[in-house]
């Protein structure tokens, strides 16, 4: 059913399916997102769940991101485990699949960019059968900060995501670490209507510009991995880790593949969250 998208994913490192979710299905998701937004009222600063846009170093009341909403909101937990999503994932990851994380990026008007990076630098595993599935909750265009991916970059090197002067890990690639294979002008914007789904490989280079429009760009992102991909930084509580299985069977015999990798250390002075950590990047693209 998704043969064309499979070929594109293997070749480019990403693909998209427009209107994968119907208007009615997205409306239901947005009902839950509204409750999540209401939960941010009264929150004064970033916490474990909510992150806010910053202006001149000061926290605003503009919601930037909700971290791991599946842990706190039953409806989102049901969505990330839904048969509709899992059936799609089987075409890319096989039968045995584990949920890794989730987040909603809100990108309000004037919302900040996300500098170019590879997710693989953040959470290395024993193999890279690992992807992020995204759902457009608003119509998404270049003007309101659509994500761009660099075709074929998932087959290449893993770049250093550290400040070249201080050595601190900043969740982004300094321009001085770029080479001829990293040219953001060759990136492909993933745009589309509400309900569009994107999938990008964990090693794919990607980033997104600021929101220059008057329309926010809400983007639900969900990470999934093959069940035999073991997190090299540890799994935390093993019971919680096992509860993240969404399809098939788990294993205690990880599949090890020789791959380029790095580890996300030493931590940035701004912490381990991408938006704040990228403040430590001195050679930005956006």
UniProtKB/Swiss-Prot annotation:
This protein's UniProt keywords: Dioxygenase, Oxidoreductase
Domain of life: Bacteria
InterPro entries hit by this protein: Phytyl_CoA_dOase-like
SUPFAM superfamilies in the record: Clavaminate synthase-like
Pfam families (alphabetical): PhyH (PF05721)
The protein's enzyme class: oxidoreductase
EC number assigned by the record: 1.-.-.-
GO molecular function: 2-oxoglutarate-dependent dioxygenase activity; iron ion binding
Keyword field contains Hydrolase: no
Signal sequence residues: none
Protein family (similarity comment): Belongs to the PhyH family.
Function: Required for hypophosphite oxidation.
Name of the protein in question: Probable alpha-ketoglutarate-dependent hypophosphite dioxygenase
Annotated source species: Stutzerimonas stutzeri (Pseudomonas stutzeri)
Gene for this chain: htxA
């Amino acid at each position: 059913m998704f043969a064309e998208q499979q070929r594109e994913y293997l070749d480019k490192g990403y693909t998209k399916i427009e209107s994968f979710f119907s208007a009615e299905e997205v409306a239901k998701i947005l009902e839950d997102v509204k409750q999540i937004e209401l939960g941010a009222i009264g929150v004064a600063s970033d916490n474990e769940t909510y992150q806010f846009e910053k202006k001149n170093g000061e926290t605003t009341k503009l919601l930037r991101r909700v971290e791991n909403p599946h842990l706190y909101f039953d409806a989102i937990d049901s969505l990330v485990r839904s048969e509709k999503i899992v059936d799609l994932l089987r075409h890319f990851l096989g039968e045995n699949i584990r949920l890794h994380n989730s987040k909603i990026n809100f990108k309000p008007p004037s919302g900040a960019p996300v500098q170019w990076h590879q997710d693989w630098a953040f959470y290395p595993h024993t193999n890279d059968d690992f992807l992020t599935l995204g759902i457009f909750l608003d119509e998404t265009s270049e003007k309101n900060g659509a994500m761009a991916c660099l075709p074929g970059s998932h087959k290449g090197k893993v770049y250093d995501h550290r400040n070249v002067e201080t050595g601190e890990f900043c969740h982004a690639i300094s321009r001085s670490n770029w080479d001829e294979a990293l040219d953001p002008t060759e990136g492909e914007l993933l745009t589309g209507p509400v309900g569009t789904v994107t999938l990008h490989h964990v090693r794919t280079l990607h980033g997104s510009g600021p929101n220059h429009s008057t329309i926010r760009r809400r983007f639900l992102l969900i990470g999934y991995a093959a069940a035999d991909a073991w997190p090299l930084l540890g799994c935390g509580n093993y019971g919680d880790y096992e509860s993240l299985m969404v399809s098939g069977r788990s294993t205690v015999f990880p599949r090890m593949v020789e791959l380029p990798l790095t580890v996300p250390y030493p931590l940035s002075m701004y912490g381990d969250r991408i938006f704040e950590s990228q403040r430590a990047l001195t050679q930005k693209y956006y």
